[in-house]
Design a protein with these regions (language model features):
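Activity-critical C-terminal alpha-helical subdomain
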Residues: 75-84, 89, 147-150, 166, ...
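C-terminal substrate-recognition/cap domain of FAD-linked oxidoreductases
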Residues: 1-177
Length: 278
């Protein structure tokens, strides 16, 4: 059968896939999905995050009466949210997507589970083509381009949602610290993060992940330094996640000592700015 999965009245795609588990072991189902619907299959669900904003989005009554309004306009949502809500999306939720060599997939899924316990995960294969640009294959950073494109099989892992311990009521879960640990491992593997998600790296760490050689050549050639922002300055969050590291470290110290004395303030209840402003 042909299944136009992006139709407003249809179940959100990840829920449709989840429903395949009900077929039973050894059962299979084949469908034909129009190309555009397939390419846009995660748009209505906002990569599985819509349930956090609109819990009724997958209910039949909502899909048939108001499903035509999905997905919400992301520019509008981002432009109208207050600072406290922006802090909440950094400290109490995760919006991350990484690409890394395919052979490391099992390791990274295990790490995502140990650090965050967020499901479902978004996973799909991708081909990385090294043409000497900002995305290079492991080991090629800073090396002159040979003129011959190199390719490698990578896997993409999207982690979108609320960490398990936060759902269970943990008010002192060190989300930023844990995401940074995952970022660090991705860098070690020669992978990279998708910059439409929140970037928790420092600028030095970001430059390890992406090859800036040609970009720096162009900056020098056109004397752009000081006139235009760096790539990192363009993509980093407007609210600095690194500003929360010291507080999260204090939670870990207090937990190891078995004392809550240093837990001065719960996340989301104070105004936080960039480092040095608190």
């Amino acid at each position: 059968p042909v299944n136009p999965v992006d139709k407003a009245t249809k179940r959100l795609f990840y829920k449709h896939v989840e429903g395949m588990l009900e077929l039973g072991e050894g059962q299979r189902r084949e469908e034909l999905i129009p190309m555009l619907d397939y390419l846009m299959r995660h748009d209505r669900s906002m990569c599985m995050c819509l349930a956090q904003i609109l819990p009724t989005a997958n209910e039949a009554w909502f899909r048939y009466t108001m499903g035509w309004m999905l997905p919400p306009n992301m520019t509008f949502l981002k432009g109208t949210r207050p600072e406290a809500e922006r802090e909440n999306t950094i400290r109490r939720q995760v919006w991350q997507e990484f690409a890394f060599p395919a052979e490391r997939f099992a390791e990274m899924v295990r790490r995502a589970h140990e650090e965050l316990e967020i499901y479902p995960l978004l996973a799909y294969p991708c081909k990385v083509i090294d043409r000497g640009g900002i995305v290079r294959l492991p080991g090629n950073h800073g090396r002159p381009y040979s003129g011959k494109p190199e390719t490698a099989a990578f896997l993409d892992l999207g982690i979108y949602g609320i960490p398990g311990r936060i759902r269970d009521g943990d008010a002192y879960f060190d989300t930023v610290t844990r995401v940074r640990r995952i970022e660090a491992r991705v860098r070690e593997l020669g992978g990279f993060l998708h910059t439409y998600c929140d970037v928790f790296s420092t600028e030095a760490e970001f430059r390890e992940m992406f090859d800036h050689s040609h970009w720096e050549d162009m900056r020098r050639k056109y004397e752009a330094a000081g006139s235009f922002p760096t790539i990192y300055e363009k993509v980093k969050p407007e609210l600095d996640p690194l500003a929360f590291l010291e507080e999260e470290e204090s939670w870990s110290r207090d937990a190891s000592l078995g004392s809550p004395s240093g837990r001065r303030c719960r996340p989301g209840l104070r105004r936080a700015g960039r480092r040095g402003d608190w």
